[in-house]
């Protein structure tokens, strides 16, 4: 039997507004959570990989606009996340796919956003928004299902600036842990036969690495482990003395917000 999963994107349609601090506004409809959120407006030109973007700790504090016109067509799955939760403050798209169809999908994008209290807005002229941000630069913004356009602009103007915010501290691991996650081998599975994929065999770990978590992505950890490193992940505030006491062969500094 086929393992293809197709989920209808059923969600409550509510009018929503995206407002920028310079007074520019865009109308649309919300999906996922409702309410009001603020963050720095930015854009991403990737044609795929929206789940990785949403869960990338580098986007903490930001409202991300996707320039690709159709988003959500393959749903959300457990393997593609870059962290344990979403980090975007809001998500702006042109059109939400009416169907999420993939044998790997476990829930729709609106369901995922509802679960994690993330506000999405669709129906926005993302081309016009992106051109505006490209020329004017990143700026504070607000998405709301409950404020007027003028109120949303004021909310954006009164929101916190990115400068001086310690997004690393809030997103770093609170406990030291060893990474032992496996990597999928997507060339082997045959979905039509019910086989949903295999994991690559992990090689023997020959070297010990300590990785500072400044907003590290799971895929970085997967690649390090897959290439023969035993990886211990530590909080961003861990002292050099504590690191040296672990006697590592190397130290890895992750990227982050």
Which ranges hold each PLM region?
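Glycine-rich beta-strand-to-loop/alpha-helix junction loops that act as flexible
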Residues: 253-257
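RNA-binding accessory domains that recognize and position tRNA/RNA substrates
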Residues: 12-246
């Amino acid at each position: 039997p086929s393992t293809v999963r197709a989920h209808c994107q059923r969600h409550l349609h509510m009018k929503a507004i995206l407002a920028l601090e310079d007074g520019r506004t865009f109308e649309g409809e919300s999906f996922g959570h409702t309410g009001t959120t603020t963050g720095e407006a930015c854009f991403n030109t990737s044609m795929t990989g929206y789940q990785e973007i949403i869960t990338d700790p580098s986007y903490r504090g930001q409202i991300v606009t996707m320039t690709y016109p159709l988003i959500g067509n393959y749903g959300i799955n457990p393997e593609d996340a870059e962290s344990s939760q979403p980090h975007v403050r809001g998500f702006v798209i042109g059109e939400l796919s009416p169907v999420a169809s993939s044998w790997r999908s476990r829930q729709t994008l609106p369901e995922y956003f509802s679960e994690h209290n993330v506000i999405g807005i669709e129906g926005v002229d993302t081309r016009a928004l992106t051109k505006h941000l490209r020329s004017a630069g990143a700026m504070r913004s607000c998405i709301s299902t409950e404020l007027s356009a003028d109120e949303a602009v004021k909310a954006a103007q009164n929101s916190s600036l990115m400068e001086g915010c310690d997004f690393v501290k809030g997103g770093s691991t609170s406990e030291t842990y060893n990474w032992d996650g496996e990597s999928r081998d997507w060339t082997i599975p045959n979905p039509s036969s019910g086989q949903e994929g295999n994991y690559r065999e992990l090689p023997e770990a020959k070297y010990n690495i300590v990785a500072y978590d400044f907003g590290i992505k799971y895929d970085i950890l997967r690649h390090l482990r897959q290439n023969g490193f035993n990886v211990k992940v530590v909080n961003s505030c861990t002292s050099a003395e504590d690191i040296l006491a672990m006697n590592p062969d190397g130290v890895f500094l992750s990227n982050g917000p």
